[in-house]
Amino acid sequence: AGTSPNNVTPGFYYWDGAKWVRLQTGAGTNNSWLTTGNTGTNASTNFLGTIDNIDLVFKRNNTQSGLLNEFRTSFGYNSLNPASTGVGLVAMGVSSLSANTTGSYLTAIGNDALNKNTTGSQNTAIGTAAMFNNTIGEYNFALGNDALKQNTSGSFNVGIGVAALTSNTLGNRNIAIGNDALKSSTNKSYNIGIGESALKNNTVGEYNIAVGSNSMENNSGSRNNVLGTFSLRNNTSGSDNTAIGYEVLYSNTTGYSNFAGGYHSLFSNTIGGGNIGIGYEALTLNTTGNSNVALGYESLKNNTTAYSNIGIGFQTLFSTTTGGGNIALGAEALKTNTVGRDNIALGLNTLTKNINGNYNFAAGFNALLNNTASNNIAIGYVSQTANTAGYSNISLGFQTLMANTTGYNNTSIGYQSLLNNTTG
């Protein structure tokens, strides 16, 4: 109002007890917040909120879309059930925590995160539909779209990555890190899958550890330990296997209790069990052979069905396919053996060219190097090194029976004993 009786600004007025005050209808200088925006605000004094202990609620189409409460915070259409009594709640995203009743200490960030949660507590879900169906599960952590999406009552799970542990419903204490890790597991527990598609199709296996992309991707076995990309990728029900390296035990399906370490070691093994392959392509072609030990570069590389062989050293028993019960210790010992069985070769190049000879014993550099026959014993430097078809010979000592080729039933003991015997 002006100073004269008729000097009045048009508008609506109210009596504040001392004077008439005009109601502001547009941008003005009072403390009203305008729906068209405000000017002249001061961040240190102006705010949108309350100055008493009353909640601040945001709504859209009369549906709660935000809440500032002493124990609960939410923002997003239909986020956080208004009837929720839980404490320590954070819901950010459309329909996040929309069904929660008494669940407490929950963090849901992303559309539909923890959407069905009712009484479950101590869960963290970050990502669209992360832990969407969880109702009573507790102490879970999900990071990534659809991570732990189907979980209902499973607890103490960690799912990090798109669709990590997405099918889990009842399983407990699983860890999945990587897109699609442990994707198909529903009710199994104590599995660890780290890497994209690690343990992806596991449904019944438990107590497995898979580290590496696609490691144990098709597994349903239990108590397997894998470190390496594509290792044990096709394992179905095989259990108690350990695979370390790229594509180790790649083809294994039902084989059990195998230990393989090194590029492509036991690569082709399918149902063979109780094998140990350590080294580059050790036992790489083994399919059904059991109880073999290969330690060294390409040791027992071509073994397929043979069993109970031991090869230690560079290319030991390299060519063996079906021969079993052999022991080779030393570089290229029994290298070309294929079907020969129950041979023992100790030393560099011992019995290297043996193919089908059986029951031979060679100890010493180049001992029985060229042998293909059976039932020979050669101990000493180049002992019986030229022998090819001779059988049932015994030689003990330096260069004993060194030149023998086809001679048989000989016994040679001592330095260069029967050195030049060839066919006798």
What label would you give each PLM region?
Residues 2, 44-424:
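Glycine- and small/polar-enriched repetitive beta-structure motifs of secreted/surface proteins
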Residues 2-26, 54-63:
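Short, surface-exposed terminal/edge motifs of secreted or surface/virion proteins that either
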Residues 18-21, 26, 39, 196, ...:
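A generic structural signal for solvent-exposed, polar alpha-helical segments
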Residues 25-57:
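Surface-exposed, low-helix, low-complexity loop/repeat segments of extracellular attachment proteins
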